[in-house]
Amino acid sequence: MAGRGGRALLALCGALAACGWLLGAEAQEPGAPAAGMRRRRRLQQEDGISFEYHRYPELREALVSVWLQCTAISRIYTVGRSFEGRELLVIELSDNPGVHEPGEPEFKYIGNMHGNEAVGRELLIFLAQYLRNEYQKGNETIVNLIHSTRIHIMPSLNPDGFEKAASQPGELKDWFVGRSNAQGIDLNRNFPDLDRIVYVNEKEGGPNNHLLKNMKKIVDQNTKLAPETKAVIHWIMDIPFVLSANLHGGDLVANYPYDETRSGSAHEYSSSPDDAIFQSLARAYSSFNPAMSNPNRPPCRKNDDDSSFVDGTTNGGAWYSVPGGMQDFNYLSSNCFEITVELSCEKFPPEETLKTYWEDNKNSLISYLEQIHRGVKGFVRDLQGNPIANATISVEGIDHDVTSAKDGDYWRLLIPGNYKLTASAPGYLAITKKVAVPYSPAVGVDFELESFSERKEEEKEELMEWWKMMSETLNF
């Protein structure tokens, strides 16, 4: 027993050392209180979930606490730093954290893009705590999700803005203070405007996806992009995300692409090629939120125009046009489908309401996460079984393609129906397959592509066989 206990202690010490930069964060935090001081915890934890606002040091503490209690299925990493130097922290939950497992889809939640929209930040901390708790209890739904999905949770994309907003006196925070990053940049207007490119391509012909392919260097050199924006762009391009949601505040609705209107008007329904699945994804969130899906809910503010809202969902352009948003950037630069969820009429509501927001959104957060296992999935390989990366998977009738990841794995979100899928890659013969797609789970469809060189060799052998047969027949 002593030996086993010693090994456990060594493991714990190693874990603590590995995250020392996290545990010692408060001393490094700009404007942090003196070492050893902690803000008074006003609310009690319930089942391991702390229903309170977490300042930057406390956010770190909360994530580290989750990790230390389930190191086998989690890790903490950072995608970069904010303008003021705070780390953009992510907690990952997976049965093999830190590794992309071939065939396993990647999911992300992002909160607090606008620093004064605080509910999403807290809900994502609560979600990480909830997933840990339920996994340890053996909750079958949660265990299956963590074993079949690589889940990335970023509670705050704008920690500088949150600290500014949280420092405002009183319970009611200003509607705008802390919205932007420390440079005064609205992060949800700061992404490359790929909508304008795809709208031109729709008319003149051109690619309908991966519009920033091989352009990381250009992104890094763009002085108009905030450091937070650049960090997320790299994140999106480095990991083969399939599904994502961006959590905001100020209304109650699940918003789907396109966010920017085609004509440039302020309000115009702007459908993407995947309008049907995006509507379904948005409803998968809103339908489990009683306040969001209530058709008789009055507008958040007296003069708000909610006429575009249907069952707690809206097309982005129909609500109001947003150029340079992160939602459309995901869809047009990568394989990732993202919606934007507005969680609360108040942007920074009183702390004692956080538990109610969690109860209203818990099932929605899980339901939306489960949507990643819809549609079609599989591998693209050559005839020798080698993976083909960056193969194109197109769906007849939907003018938006996805591509395979480095292991040849791909995922294509679709609503139920009958489809024709075509896999193609440079130097290979394309293959088309018919597939019937249920609501869930995703149907497995693999493709084996024959290279042109293999086909030429095969045709050469067939010609030689034909010549041999003709020679024998005619006694040449």
From Swiss-Prot:
Main location per the UniProt record: cytoplasm
Q: Which organism is it from?
A: Macaca fascicularis (Crab-eating macaque)
What EC designation does it have? 3.4.17.10
Q: Which residues form the Peptidase M14 domain?
A: 52-372
Q: Quote the catalytic residue positions.
A: E342
Q: Which Gene3D superfamilies match?
A: Carboxypeptidase-like, regulatory domain, Zn peptidases
> What's a Pfam family this protein contains?
CarboxypepD_reg
The record ties this protein, via SMART domains, to: Zn_pept
Which family would the database say this protein is a member of?
Belongs to the peptidase M14 family.
- Recorded protein name is Carboxypeptidase E
Q: How does it sit in the membrane?
A: Peripheral membrane protein
Glycosylated sites = N139, N390
User: What gene is this protein a product of?
Assistant: CPE
